Swiss-Prot record:
<protein>
    <recommendedName>
        <fullName>D-ribose pyranase</fullName>
        <ecNumber>5.4.99.62</ecNumber>
    </recommendedName>
</protein>
<dbReference type="GO" id="GO:0005829">
    <property type="term" value="C:cytosol"/>
</dbReference>
<dbReference type="GO" id="GO:0019303">
    <property type="term" value="P:D-ribose catabolic process"/>
</dbReference>
<comment type="pathway">
    <text>Carbohydrate metabolism; D-ribose degradation; D-ribose 5-phosphate from beta-D-ribopyranose: step 1/2.</text>
</comment>
<keyword id="KW-0413">Isomerase</keyword>
<keyword id="KW-0963">Cytoplasm</keyword>
<keyword id="KW-0119">Carbohydrate metabolism</keyword>
<dbReference type="GO" id="GO:0048029">
    <property type="term" value="F:monosaccharide binding"/>
</dbReference>
<comment type="similarity">
    <text>Belongs to the RbsD / FucU family. RbsD subfamily.</text>
</comment>
<feature type="binding site">
    <location>
        <position position="28"/>
    </location>
    <ligand>
        <name>substrate</name>
    </ligand>
</feature>
<feature type="active site" description="Proton donor">
    <location>
        <position position="20"/>
    </location>
</feature>
<feature type="binding site">
    <location>
        <begin position="123"/>
        <end position="125"/>
    </location>
    <ligand>
        <name>substrate</name>
    </ligand>
</feature>
<dbReference type="GO" id="GO:0016872">
    <property type="term" value="F:intramolecular lyase activity"/>
</dbReference>
<dbReference type="InterPro" id="IPR007721">
    <property type="entry name" value="RbsD_FucU"/>
</dbReference>
<dbReference type="InterPro" id="IPR023750">
    <property type="entry name" value="RbsD-like_sf"/>
</dbReference>
<dbReference type="Pfam" id="PF05025">
    <property type="entry name" value="RbsD_FucU"/>
</dbReference>
<comment type="function">
    <text>Catalyzes the interconversion of beta-pyran and beta-furan forms of D-ribose.</text>
</comment>
Length: 134
């Protein structure tokens, strides 16, 4: 059995295929994720699994250099924003973009996976930009 944190085969595969500057997104239950090979649906019921738990686990296995968040999270979900900031290194650049741009980036060619959680708080979506480990 796999020893590292992520047991889901689709998330493991997405992370294994990521190169420098590639993206992986983690999203709330309401994000309109395209129904293609990049969709990884973990949602079981409302708030299961939670966005922040999935993010924490992914960060154990993925080296990131930058994150993208919806500008709207500042006003509509400051608690989630604070939790995200607690999880990431202060060296990681945070870029705020309009939520509509977050949605359009789900189909970006550099995006290797779109994880859907059961999260039901607004604007709980993040794009992780990969870094190298050397």
């Amino acid at each position: 059995m796999k020893k590292s944190a992520i047991l889901n085969e689709h998330i493991s595969k997405a992370i294994a295929t990521i190169g420098h500057f590639d993206l992986l997104t983690i999203n709330d239950a309401g994000m309109p994720i395209p129904n293609d090979h990049r969709r990884i649906d973990l949602a079981v019921t409302k708030n299961l699994p939670r966005f922040i738990d999935v993010l924490a686990t992914v960060l154990e296995e993925m080296e990131i250099q930058k994150i993208y968040l919806a500008e709207e999270i500042k006003e509509h979900n400051p608690t989630q924003l604070q939790q995200i900031k607690q999880l990431i290194s202060s060296e990681i650049e945070i870029i705020f973009i309009p939520h509509e741009e977050m949605k359009s980036n789900l189909a970006h060619p550099l995006n290797k996976g779109n994880i859907r959680t059961g999260e039901t708080t607004p604007y709980s979506n993040i794009a992780l930009e990969s870094n190298v480990t050397f």
